[in-house]
Design a protein with these regions (language model features):
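Active-site core segments that coordinate phosphate-bearing ligands/cofactors
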Residues: 5-7, 107, 114-126, 131, ...
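A conserved helix-loop-beta module that forms one wall/lid of the active-site cleft
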Residues: 200-213
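N-terminal glycine/serine-rich phosphate-binding loop of ATP-dependent small-molecule kinases
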Residues: 1-97, 124, 152, 226-227, ...
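Short beta-strand-loop/turn "lid" adjacent to the catalytic site in phosphate-handling enzymes
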Residues: 64-100, 129-133, 164-185, 210-215, ...
Length: 498
Protein backbone atom coordinates (compact mmCIF):
# COMPACT_ATOMS: atom_id res chain seq x y z
CA UNK A 1 0.00 0.00 0.00
CA UNK A 2 1.48 3.33 -1.12
CA UNK A 3 1.84 5.86 1.69
CA UNK A 4 0.95 9.54 1.30
CA UNK A 5 1.34 12.75 3.27
CA UNK A 6 -1.38 15.40 3.27
CA UNK A 7 -0.55 19.11 3.08
CA UNK A 8 -3.22 21.75 3.72
CA UNK A 9 -2.66 25.37 2.67
CA UNK A 10 -4.97 28.11 3.96
CA UNK A 11 -4.41 31.42 2.16
CA UNK A 12 -6.31 34.63 1.73
CA UNK A 13 -8.59 33.41 -1.06
CA UNK A 14 -8.27 29.62 -1.26
CA UNK A 15 -8.04 26.56 0.94
CA UNK A 16 -6.03 23.84 -0.79
CA UNK A 17 -5.20 20.23 -0.02
CA UNK A 18 -2.44 18.21 -1.69
CA UNK A 19 -1.27 14.61 -1.44
CA UNK A 20 2.39 13.59 -1.90
CA UNK A 21 4.19 10.27 -1.77
CA UNK A 22 7.48 9.53 -0.01
CA UNK A 23 9.49 10.96 -2.95
CA UNK A 24 7.40 14.14 -3.09
CA UNK A 25 5.41 13.18 -6.17
CA UNK A 26 2.00 14.84 -6.26
CA UNK A 27 -0.98 12.48 -6.19
CA UNK A 28 -3.64 15.16 -6.34
CA UNK A 29 -4.59 18.71 -5.35
CA UNK A 30 -8.02 20.16 -4.61
CA UNK A 31 -8.95 23.74 -3.79
CA UNK A 32 -12.02 25.56 -2.56
CA UNK A 33 -12.60 29.33 -2.43
CA UNK A 34 -12.65 31.13 0.90
CA UNK A 35 -14.95 33.99 1.75
CA UNK A 36 -13.59 37.10 3.46
CA UNK A 37 -16.15 39.22 5.28
CA UNK A 38 -15.96 43.01 5.51
CA UNK A 39 -18.77 44.18 7.81
CA UNK A 40 -17.18 47.64 8.01
CA UNK A 41 -14.66 49.51 5.83
CA UNK A 42 -11.14 48.28 6.50
CA UNK A 43 -12.30 45.14 8.29
CA UNK A 44 -11.40 41.64 7.06
CA UNK A 45 -12.92 38.66 8.83
CA UNK A 46 -13.59 34.98 8.32
CA UNK A 47 -16.35 32.78 9.71
CA UNK A 48 -14.45 30.16 11.74
CA UNK A 49 -17.14 27.49 11.53
CA UNK A 50 -17.40 27.99 7.78
CA UNK A 51 -13.60 27.66 7.45
CA UNK A 52 -13.69 24.31 9.23
CA UNK A 53 -16.54 23.15 7.00
CA UNK A 54 -14.46 24.15 3.97
CA UNK A 55 -11.45 22.29 5.36
CA UNK A 56 -13.43 19.08 5.81
CA UNK A 57 -14.93 19.44 2.33
CA UNK A 58 -11.60 19.95 0.56
CA UNK A 59 -10.14 16.88 2.30
CA UNK A 60 -13.13 14.75 1.29
CA UNK A 61 -12.90 15.98 -2.32
CA UNK A 62 -9.17 15.26 -2.43
CA UNK A 63 -9.64 11.69 -1.23
CA UNK A 64 -12.50 11.12 -3.66
CA UNK A 65 -10.76 12.53 -6.74
CA UNK A 66 -7.34 10.99 -6.01
CA UNK A 67 -8.64 7.54 -5.13
CA UNK A 68 -6.41 7.56 -2.05
CA UNK A 69 -7.94 6.22 1.17
CA UNK A 70 -7.54 7.73 4.61
CA UNK A 71 -5.70 4.53 5.61
CA UNK A 72 -2.89 5.44 3.19
CA UNK A 73 -2.24 8.88 4.72
CA UNK A 74 0.46 8.64 7.39
CA UNK A 75 1.03 12.29 8.27
CA UNK A 76 -0.60 15.72 7.94
CA UNK A 77 0.76 19.27 7.97
CA UNK A 78 -0.75 22.72 7.50
CA UNK A 79 0.67 25.88 5.95
CA UNK A 80 -1.20 29.15 6.39
CA UNK A 81 -1.15 32.91 6.35
CA UNK A 82 0.47 34.54 9.32
CA UNK A 83 -0.81 37.13 11.79
CA UNK A 84 -4.49 37.81 12.27
CA UNK A 85 -6.47 36.45 15.20
CA UNK A 86 -8.44 33.23 15.76
CA UNK A 87 -10.06 33.08 19.19
CA UNK A 88 -11.74 30.38 21.23
CA UNK A 89 -13.83 31.23 24.26
CA UNK A 90 -13.45 29.60 27.67
CA UNK A 91 -15.76 26.79 26.55
CA UNK A 92 -13.59 26.05 23.49
CA UNK A 93 -16.05 27.55 21.03
CA UNK A 94 -15.13 30.03 18.26
CA UNK A 95 -15.37 33.52 19.75
CA UNK A 96 -16.87 35.57 16.94
CA UNK A 97 -15.34 35.75 13.49
CA UNK A 98 -11.61 35.35 12.96
CA UNK A 99 -9.85 38.60 12.06
CA UNK A 100 -7.47 38.36 9.09
CA UNK A 101 -4.02 39.88 8.72
CA UNK A 102 -5.27 42.37 6.10
CA UNK A 103 -7.66 43.94 8.65
CA UNK A 104 -6.98 47.63 9.37
CA UNK A 105 -9.35 48.41 12.24
CA UNK A 106 -6.45 48.82 14.69
CA UNK A 107 -4.79 51.62 12.72
CA UNK A 108 -5.35 54.26 15.41
CA UNK A 109 -3.98 51.94 18.08
CA UNK A 110 -0.83 51.31 16.04
CA UNK A 111 -0.47 55.03 15.39
CA UNK A 112 -0.78 55.73 19.11
CA UNK A 113 1.83 53.09 19.90
CA UNK A 114 4.15 54.65 17.34
CA UNK A 115 3.75 58.07 18.95
CA UNK A 116 4.51 56.51 22.36
CA UNK A 117 7.68 54.80 21.10
CA UNK A 118 6.36 51.27 21.71
CA UNK A 119 7.79 49.76 18.47
CA UNK A 120 11.31 50.85 19.44
CA UNK A 121 10.80 49.28 22.86
CA UNK A 122 9.53 45.98 21.46
CA UNK A 123 11.91 45.47 18.54
CA UNK A 124 15.06 44.38 20.43
CA UNK A 125 13.04 41.58 22.03
CA UNK A 126 10.61 40.56 19.27
CA UNK A 127 12.44 41.60 16.08
CA UNK A 128 9.04 42.66 14.74
CA UNK A 129 7.57 45.91 13.54
CA UNK A 130 4.06 46.82 14.68
CA UNK A 131 1.16 46.95 12.28
CA UNK A 132 -2.58 46.58 12.19
CA UNK A 133 -2.80 42.86 11.38
CA UNK A 134 -0.66 41.68 14.28
CA UNK A 135 -2.49 39.63 16.92
CA UNK A 136 -1.41 42.11 19.59
CA UNK A 137 -2.92 45.08 17.73
CA UNK A 138 -6.20 43.25 17.24
CA UNK A 139 -6.29 42.08 20.85
CA UNK A 140 -5.82 45.64 22.07
CA UNK A 141 -8.60 46.80 19.73
CA UNK A 142 -10.93 44.17 21.18
CA UNK A 143 -10.04 45.24 24.71
CA UNK A 144 -10.94 48.85 23.92
CA UNK A 145 -13.94 48.34 21.63
CA UNK A 146 -15.44 44.94 22.54
CA UNK A 147 -14.50 44.42 26.21
CA UNK A 148 -17.14 41.73 26.79
CA UNK A 149 -15.73 39.61 23.97
CA UNK A 150 -12.18 40.28 25.17
CA UNK A 151 -13.08 39.04 28.65
CA UNK A 152 -14.32 35.73 27.20
CA UNK A 153 -11.03 34.85 25.44
CA UNK A 154 -9.94 31.34 26.34
CA UNK A 155 -7.31 30.69 23.65
CA UNK A 156 -5.37 32.85 21.18
CA UNK A 157 -4.37 31.21 17.90
CA UNK A 158 -3.65 31.92 14.25
CA UNK A 159 -5.01 30.21 11.14
CA UNK A 160 -3.17 26.88 11.05
CA UNK A 161 -3.31 26.59 14.84
CA UNK A 162 -7.10 26.77 14.65
CA UNK A 163 -7.34 24.18 11.85
CA UNK A 164 -4.93 21.87 13.70
CA UNK A 165 -7.12 22.18 16.80
CA UNK A 166 -10.18 21.31 14.71
CA UNK A 167 -8.43 18.20 13.39
CA UNK A 168 -6.94 17.01 16.68
CA UNK A 169 -8.58 18.79 19.61
CA UNK A 170 -5.10 19.84 20.81
CA UNK A 171 -4.18 23.52 21.25
CA UNK A 172 -0.84 25.03 20.32
CA UNK A 173 0.82 27.89 18.46
CA UNK A 174 3.35 26.84 15.81
CA UNK A 175 6.74 28.50 16.23
CA UNK A 176 7.50 29.86 12.74
CA UNK A 177 4.21 31.77 12.90
CA UNK A 178 3.88 32.78 16.56
CA UNK A 179 7.50 34.02 16.54
CA UNK A 180 6.26 36.88 14.34
CA UNK A 181 3.37 37.94 16.56
CA UNK A 182 4.99 40.39 19.02
CA UNK A 183 3.98 37.92 21.74
CA UNK A 184 7.27 36.00 21.45
CA UNK A 185 10.78 36.94 22.62
CA UNK A 186 13.07 36.00 19.73
CA UNK A 187 16.20 35.64 21.88
CA UNK A 188 14.51 33.58 24.59
CA UNK A 189 12.50 31.48 22.15
CA UNK A 190 9.30 31.73 24.18
CA UNK A 191 6.44 33.99 25.20
CA UNK A 192 7.47 37.01 27.25
CA UNK A 193 4.97 38.60 29.68
CA UNK A 194 6.87 41.89 29.41
CA UNK A 195 5.51 42.25 25.88
CA UNK A 196 1.84 41.91 26.74
CA UNK A 197 2.38 44.21 29.71
CA UNK A 198 3.88 46.96 27.52
CA UNK A 199 1.05 46.53 25.02
CA UNK A 200 -1.65 46.67 27.67
CA UNK A 201 -3.02 43.16 27.05
CA UNK A 202 -1.52 41.19 29.94
CA UNK A 203 -4.95 39.68 30.63
CA UNK A 204 -4.50 37.23 27.73
CA UNK A 205 -1.28 35.59 29.01
CA UNK A 206 -3.31 32.65 30.32
CA UNK A 207 -4.84 32.18 26.85
CA UNK A 208 -1.55 31.62 25.00
CA UNK A 209 -1.23 27.88 24.24
CA UNK A 210 2.10 26.00 24.16
CA UNK A 211 4.56 26.81 21.38
CA UNK A 212 5.05 23.80 19.08
CA UNK A 213 7.63 23.02 16.40
CA UNK A 214 6.96 22.87 12.67
CA UNK A 215 7.66 19.13 12.44
CA UNK A 216 6.58 18.29 15.98
CA UNK A 217 3.71 15.82 16.18
CA UNK A 218 1.13 17.87 18.08
CA UNK A 219 -1.86 15.58 18.01
CA UNK A 220 -3.76 12.95 16.09
CA UNK A 221 -6.89 12.92 13.97
CA UNK A 222 -9.83 12.43 16.31
CA UNK A 223 -12.53 9.82 15.79
CA UNK A 224 -15.04 12.59 15.06
CA UNK A 225 -12.76 14.22 12.48
CA UNK A 226 -12.19 10.84 10.86
CA UNK A 227 -15.93 10.39 10.32
CA UNK A 228 -16.30 13.91 8.90
CA UNK A 229 -13.29 13.84 6.54
CA UNK A 230 -12.51 10.25 5.59
CA UNK A 231 -9.12 10.44 7.30
CA UNK A 232 -8.00 7.67 9.64
CA UNK A 233 -8.35 8.27 13.38
CA UNK A 234 -4.92 8.42 15.00
CA UNK A 235 -3.11 9.88 11.95
CA UNK A 236 -0.39 12.23 13.30
CA UNK A 237 -0.63 15.97 12.65
CA UNK A 238 2.50 18.16 12.87
CA UNK A 239 2.76 21.83 13.85
CA UNK A 240 3.00 23.08 10.27
CA UNK A 241 4.42 26.24 8.74
CA UNK A 242 3.92 29.95 8.28
CA UNK A 243 3.28 30.13 4.51
CA UNK A 244 6.28 32.41 3.93
CA UNK A 245 8.51 29.76 5.52
CA UNK A 246 6.88 27.04 3.44
CA UNK A 247 7.58 29.01 0.28
CA UNK A 248 11.22 29.62 1.23
CA UNK A 249 11.65 25.89 1.81
CA UNK A 250 10.15 25.01 -1.56
CA UNK A 251 12.20 27.69 -3.30
CA UNK A 252 15.36 26.07 -1.98
CA UNK A 253 16.62 29.11 -0.06
CA UNK A 254 19.54 27.95 2.08
CA UNK A 255 22.29 30.60 1.97
CA UNK A 256 22.79 34.38 1.90
CA UNK A 257 23.37 34.58 -1.87
CA UNK A 258 19.75 33.97 -2.88
CA UNK A 259 16.54 35.68 -1.77
CA UNK A 260 12.94 34.55 -2.21
CA UNK A 261 10.24 36.92 -3.44
CA UNK A 262 6.64 35.85 -2.88
CA UNK A 263 4.11 37.59 -5.10
CA UNK A 264 0.52 37.14 -3.98
CA UNK A 265 -1.74 39.30 -1.84
CA UNK A 266 1.48 40.15 -0.03
CA UNK A 267 4.80 41.31 -1.42
CA UNK A 268 7.36 39.39 0.64
CA UNK A 269 11.12 39.23 0.23
CA UNK A 270 12.85 36.67 2.45
CA UNK A 271 16.34 35.46 3.23
CA UNK A 272 17.80 32.87 5.60
CA UNK A 273 20.50 33.65 8.15
CA UNK A 274 22.12 32.26 11.28
CA UNK A 275 21.83 34.40 14.39
CA UNK A 276 20.38 37.82 15.13
CA UNK A 277 22.13 41.09 14.32
CA UNK A 278 21.94 44.34 16.22
CA UNK A 279 22.26 47.88 14.85
CA UNK A 280 20.94 47.13 11.37
CA UNK A 281 19.95 49.80 8.84
CA UNK A 282 16.26 48.85 8.94
CA UNK A 283 14.00 47.10 11.48
CA UNK A 284 14.02 43.83 9.55
CA UNK A 285 11.37 41.30 10.53
CA UNK A 286 12.87 38.06 11.86
CA UNK A 287 11.13 34.75 12.45
CA UNK A 288 12.14 31.32 13.63
CA UNK A 289 13.09 29.10 10.70
CA UNK A 290 12.73 25.33 10.57
CA UNK A 291 16.44 24.55 11.07
CA UNK A 292 18.04 24.96 14.50
CA UNK A 293 19.86 28.27 14.88
CA UNK A 294 18.45 29.72 11.66
CA UNK A 295 16.08 32.63 11.18
CA UNK A 296 14.02 33.83 8.26
CA UNK A 297 14.43 37.56 7.66
CA UNK A 298 11.92 39.41 5.56
CA UNK A 299 10.35 42.61 4.41
CA UNK A 300 6.69 42.57 3.49
CA UNK A 301 3.56 44.56 2.73
CA UNK A 302 0.14 43.73 1.20
CA UNK A 303 1.07 45.44 -2.08
CA UNK A 304 1.46 42.70 -4.66
CA UNK A 305 -0.69 40.89 -7.22
CA UNK A 306 -3.87 41.20 -5.17
CA UNK A 307 -4.09 44.65 -6.77
CA UNK A 308 -4.35 43.06 -10.22
CA UNK A 309 -7.05 40.67 -9.01
CA UNK A 310 -9.12 43.60 -7.77
CA UNK A 311 -8.65 45.53 -11.02
CA UNK A 312 -9.63 42.65 -13.29
CA UNK A 313 -12.70 41.98 -11.13
CA UNK A 314 -13.89 45.52 -11.89
CA UNK A 315 -13.29 45.18 -15.66
CA UNK A 316 -15.07 41.86 -16.07
CA UNK A 317 -13.64 38.67 -17.50
CA UNK A 318 -10.10 39.01 -18.85
CA UNK A 319 -7.68 36.11 -18.91
CA UNK A 320 -4.12 36.15 -17.62
CA UNK A 321 -2.93 35.48 -21.19
CA UNK A 322 -4.83 38.53 -22.46
CA UNK A 323 -3.34 40.67 -19.70
CA UNK A 324 0.18 39.54 -20.56
CA UNK A 325 -0.37 40.17 -24.26
CA UNK A 326 -1.66 43.67 -23.52
CA UNK A 327 1.32 44.54 -21.32
CA UNK A 328 3.81 43.05 -23.79
CA UNK A 329 2.35 45.14 -26.63
CA UNK A 330 3.63 48.38 -25.06
CA UNK A 331 7.19 49.78 -24.94
CA UNK A 332 9.04 48.83 -21.77
CA UNK A 333 9.33 51.61 -19.17
CA UNK A 334 7.48 53.92 -21.53
CA UNK A 335 5.24 56.77 -20.46
CA UNK A 336 4.56 58.50 -17.17
CA UNK A 337 1.53 56.58 -15.95
CA UNK A 338 1.99 55.23 -12.42
CA UNK A 339 -0.02 52.94 -10.19
CA UNK A 340 0.35 52.87 -6.41
CA UNK A 341 -0.45 49.26 -5.34
CA UNK A 342 -1.82 50.16 -1.93
CA UNK A 343 -5.38 48.80 -2.09
CA UNK A 344 -4.83 46.61 0.98
CA UNK A 345 -2.15 48.59 2.80
CA UNK A 346 1.14 50.24 1.96
CA UNK A 347 4.89 50.18 2.58
CA UNK A 348 5.03 53.98 2.52
CA UNK A 349 3.09 54.96 5.64
CA UNK A 350 -0.26 54.19 7.24
CA UNK A 351 -2.06 57.00 5.40
CA UNK A 352 -1.05 56.01 1.87
CA UNK A 353 -3.78 54.68 -0.41
CA UNK A 354 -3.96 53.35 -3.95
CA UNK A 355 -4.49 55.11 -7.24
CA UNK A 356 -3.29 55.87 -10.76
CA UNK A 357 -1.33 59.04 -11.44
CA UNK A 358 -0.62 60.56 -14.84
CA UNK A 359 -3.68 59.19 -16.60
CA UNK A 360 -4.74 60.92 -19.82
CA UNK A 361 -7.33 60.32 -22.53
CA UNK A 362 -4.75 58.53 -24.70
CA UNK A 363 -4.39 55.73 -22.19
CA UNK A 364 -6.08 52.38 -22.76
CA UNK A 365 -6.75 49.38 -20.60
CA UNK A 366 -3.37 48.01 -21.69
CA UNK A 367 -1.63 51.08 -20.25
CA UNK A 368 -3.45 50.64 -16.94
CA UNK A 369 -2.47 46.97 -16.79
CA UNK A 370 1.15 47.82 -17.55
CA UNK A 371 1.09 50.44 -14.79
CA UNK A 372 -0.23 47.82 -12.34
CA UNK A 373 2.53 45.38 -13.32
CA UNK A 374 5.12 48.12 -12.88
CA UNK A 375 3.64 49.41 -9.63
CA UNK A 376 3.70 45.95 -8.08
CA UNK A 377 7.32 45.45 -9.15
CA UNK A 378 8.30 48.90 -7.86
CA UNK A 379 6.68 48.11 -4.51
CA UNK A 380 8.61 44.84 -4.35
CA UNK A 381 11.76 46.85 -5.04
CA UNK A 382 11.17 48.82 -1.83
CA UNK A 383 11.58 45.59 0.11
CA UNK A 384 14.21 44.06 -2.13
CA UNK A 385 16.49 47.09 -1.87
CA UNK A 386 16.26 47.07 1.91
CA UNK A 387 16.99 43.34 1.98
CA UNK A 388 20.02 43.79 -0.26
CA UNK A 389 21.47 46.08 2.39
CA UNK A 390 21.16 43.16 4.83
CA UNK A 391 22.16 40.44 2.31
CA UNK A 392 24.86 42.33 0.43
CA UNK A 393 26.14 39.36 -1.62
CA UNK A 394 22.82 38.46 -3.23
CA UNK A 395 22.92 37.80 -6.98
CA UNK A 396 19.75 35.73 -7.47
CA UNK A 397 16.06 36.20 -6.71
CA UNK A 398 13.85 33.11 -6.63
CA UNK A 399 10.22 34.02 -7.24
CA UNK A 400 7.07 32.13 -6.29
CA UNK A 401 3.39 32.99 -6.50
CA UNK A 402 0.88 33.58 -9.28
CA UNK A 403 2.89 36.21 -11.20
CA UNK A 404 5.73 33.69 -11.57
CA UNK A 405 3.58 32.12 -14.32
CA UNK A 406 3.92 35.31 -16.39
CA UNK A 407 7.19 35.61 -18.32
CA UNK A 408 6.22 39.21 -19.12
CA UNK A 409 5.95 40.12 -15.44
CA UNK A 410 9.04 38.12 -14.45
CA UNK A 411 11.15 39.69 -17.20
CA UNK A 412 9.99 43.09 -15.95
CA UNK A 413 11.14 42.13 -12.44
CA UNK A 414 14.52 41.03 -13.83
CA UNK A 415 14.89 44.24 -15.83
CA UNK A 416 13.91 46.51 -12.93
CA UNK A 417 16.01 44.73 -10.30
CA UNK A 418 19.00 43.86 -12.47
CA UNK A 419 19.05 40.43 -10.80
CA UNK A 420 19.00 36.90 -12.14
CA UNK A 421 15.44 35.61 -11.68
CA UNK A 422 14.93 31.92 -10.96
CA UNK A 423 11.50 30.30 -11.04
CA UNK A 424 11.28 27.03 -9.05
CA UNK A 425 8.97 24.62 -10.84
CA UNK A 426 6.72 23.73 -7.92
CA UNK A 427 3.04 24.56 -8.18
CA UNK A 428 1.64 24.48 -4.66
CA UNK A 429 4.35 25.64 -2.27
CA UNK A 430 1.95 25.76 0.68
CA UNK A 431 0.66 22.20 0.28
CA UNK A 432 4.06 20.79 -0.64
CA UNK A 433 5.82 22.50 2.27
CA UNK A 434 3.16 21.41 4.75
CA UNK A 435 3.42 17.81 3.56
CA UNK A 436 7.21 18.10 3.77
CA UNK A 437 6.89 19.11 7.43
CA UNK A 438 4.74 16.02 7.96
CA UNK A 439 7.36 13.81 6.31
CA UNK A 440 10.05 15.22 8.60
CA UNK A 441 7.79 14.77 11.62
CA UNK A 442 7.00 11.15 10.79
CA UNK A 443 10.65 10.22 10.30
CA UNK A 444 11.07 10.11 6.52
CA UNK A 445 13.86 12.69 6.95
CA UNK A 446 16.04 13.48 9.96
CA UNK A 447 15.47 17.21 9.52
CA UNK A 448 14.42 19.85 7.01
CA UNK A 449 17.95 20.26 5.63
CA UNK A 450 18.02 16.63 4.55
CA UNK A 451 14.53 16.94 3.09
CA UNK A 452 15.45 20.07 1.14
CA UNK A 453 18.56 18.46 -0.34
CA UNK A 454 16.57 15.41 -1.40
CA UNK A 455 13.69 17.33 -2.99
CA UNK A 456 15.27 20.04 -5.13
CA UNK A 457 12.91 21.28 -7.83
CA UNK A 458 13.94 22.21 -11.40
CA UNK A 459 14.37 25.95 -11.95
CA UNK A 460 13.75 28.23 -14.96
CA UNK A 461 16.01 31.27 -15.31
CA UNK A 462 15.47 34.77 -16.71
CA UNK A 463 18.32 37.27 -17.05
CA UNK A 464 17.96 41.07 -16.97
CA UNK A 465 18.31 43.28 -20.04
CA UNK A 466 20.68 45.90 -18.63
CA UNK A 467 19.74 48.49 -21.28
CA UNK A 468 16.11 48.27 -20.20
CA UNK A 469 17.31 48.21 -16.58
CA UNK A 470 18.62 51.76 -16.95
CA UNK A 471 15.28 52.95 -18.32
CA UNK A 472 13.37 51.28 -15.52
CA UNK A 473 15.67 52.75 -12.89
CA UNK A 474 14.76 56.21 -14.14
CA UNK A 475 11.05 55.42 -13.96
CA UNK A 476 11.47 53.82 -10.53
CA UNK A 477 13.08 57.03 -9.28
CA UNK A 478 10.07 59.00 -10.53
CA UNK A 479 7.81 56.53 -8.70
CA UNK A 480 9.77 57.19 -5.51
CA UNK A 481 9.44 60.96 -6.02
CA UNK A 482 5.68 60.55 -6.41
CA UNK A 483 5.52 58.55 -3.17
CA UNK A 484 7.52 61.25 -1.36
CA UNK A 485 5.23 63.99 -2.67
CA UNK A 486 2.14 62.13 -1.46
CA UNK A 487 3.73 61.51 1.91
CA UNK A 488 4.21 65.26 2.18
CA UNK A 489 0.57 65.80 1.23
CA UNK A 490 -0.62 63.44 3.96
CA UNK A 491 1.69 65.05 6.51
CA UNK A 492 0.23 68.49 5.75
CA UNK A 493 -3.33 67.13 5.98
CA UNK A 494 -2.49 65.59 9.35
CA UNK A 495 -1.03 68.88 10.60
CA UNK A 496 -4.15 70.73 9.47
CA UNK A 497 -6.43 68.24 11.25
CA UNK A 498 -4.40 68.42 14.44
Amino acid sequence: MTQYWLGLDCGGSWLKAGLYDREGREAGVQRLPLCALSPQPGWAERDMAELWQCCMAVIRELLTHSGVSGEQIVGIGISAQGKGLFLLDKNNKPLGNAILSSDRRAMEIVRRWQEDGIPEKLYPLTRQTLWTGHPVSLLRWLKEHEPERYAQIGCVMMTHDYLRWCLTGVKGCEESNISESNLYNMSLGEYDPCLTDWLGIAEINHALPPVVGSAEICGEITAQTAVLTGLKAGTPVVGGLFDVVSTALCAGIEDEFTLNAVMGTWAVTSGITRGLRDGEAHPYVYGRYVNDGEFIVHEASPTSSGNLEWFTAQWGEISFDEINQAVASLPKAGGDLFFLPFLYGSNAGLEMTSGFYGMQAIHTRAHLLQAIYEGVVFSHMTHLNRMRERFSDVHTLRVTGGPAHSDVWMQMLADVSGLRIELPQVEETGCFGAALAARVGTGVYRDFSEAQRDLQHPVRTLLPDMTVHQLYQQKYQRYQHLIAALQGFHARIKEHIL
